A protein has these predicted regions:
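Surface-exposed, non-catalytic interaction/assembly patches
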Residues: 250-277
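Intein-associated homing endonuclease modules of the LAGLIDADG/DOD-type, together
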Residues: 3-7, 12-243, 268-303
């Protein structure tokens, strides 16, 4: 498993037992269930103020607050009216090993979301130079360019992406890309974002990816969460597609304007804790320095 810093740690003990349990509701609608011994590493209002004031000139040393669920249920979750008191910071990027990939991650991500048909791509003027340079930097030759005034530019490359992926042309993101190193996954996400440049909303400094394919949008959500970003996923019933929204301080496209990362990307607030029926529980211990491990789809830190 992985700890809050994204490092792989070895599980040293697993025990099964039944216990009275609680369900913790988070601000992005995710939930975590566990018994009273489940621990969280939490931010308080004072911690968040100090994190906001931190300029990154020296190491941030303020510790997170360790609280068990049995203690949390007796504490107020709100203060000063309706403000939420406790929050769980997102984890750091998961540290997977570097992968030897058939197509560079940026190029694959761009191909995956942009291709009109075999070896035909379209690109807007806003990120034309950046994307073309990326292809050239990775050894591709731009073989055909059709510029249309006021519209997207159509281009082809050699060698073709399809020829490098033979014998299997994937219709979803292969696992070796999703389990690649941090730098490779950021490049993959950058390629996906640059494939359709209107996916970045500059006024709000956030990204929005839309798809009608459930498996595809879940893969991209897992990719984004694995580099330490919190996501929000919605289904628009009246137009039949899924929308994935998130913020990232990693530079994913040329026109992005985001502040640098100083401590972590973002956080989830605890909104409610409710009693639930007795359930089968699993006690886990690891050999990590702080005993933390990540759970659920959002890679949420527990202990």
């Amino acid at each position: 498993v992985f700890d809050q810093n994204g490092n792989p740690v070895r599980v040293t003990l697993v025990q099964h037992f039944e216990s009275n349990c609680y369900k913790v509701h988070l601000s992005d609608l995710m939930t975590i269930s566990g018994n009273g011994a489940l621990n969280f590493l939490l931010e308080t209002p004072k911690y968040r103020i100090r994190a906001l004031e931190h300029k990154g000139k020296r190491e941030f040393k303020r510790p997170l607050v360790l609280l068990a669920l049995s203690e949390l249920i007796n504490k107020p979750l709100k203060y000063k009216g309706n403000k939420l008191f406790f929050s769980i910071p997102t984890c750091k990027p998961l540290k997977f090993p570097h992968q030897d990939l058939p197509v560079p991650p940026f190029i694959f991500g761009f191909w995956f979301k942009n291709r009109l048909r075999a070896n035909i791509f379209s690109i807007k003027d806003l990120n034309y130079k950046e994307v073309i340079q990326k292809f050239k930097d990775h050894g591709y030759e731009i073989t055909k360019t059709v510029k249309r005034k006021g519209r997207a530019t159509i281009f082809s490359v050699y060698p073709t992406i399809e020829s490098q992926l033979i014998p299997f042309i994937p219709n979803q993101i292969p696992n070796n890309y999703l389990l690649a190193s941090e730098e490779q996954r950021i490049e993959l996400l950058s390629g996906i974002i640059n494939a359709k440049i209107n996916q970045y909303k500059k006024p709000r400094d956030h990204f929005r990816i839309a798809s009608t394919n459930w498996n595809e949008i879940r893969q991209i959500q897992s990719l984004v969460e694995s580099i330490g970003c919190k996501t929000s996923l919605h289904y628009r019933d009246y137009i039949k597609y899924y929308t994935l929204s998130f913020k990232s301080r990693y530079k994913l496209c040329e026109n992005q304007e985001s502040p640098p990362i100083r401590i972590h990307q973002t956080r989830r607030y605890i909104t409610e804790i409710e009693n639930i029926a007795t359930q089968q529980c699993v006690h886990i211990e690891t050999d990590g320095p702080d005993g933390s491990f990540l759970v659920n789809e959002g890679f949420i830190t527990c202990r």
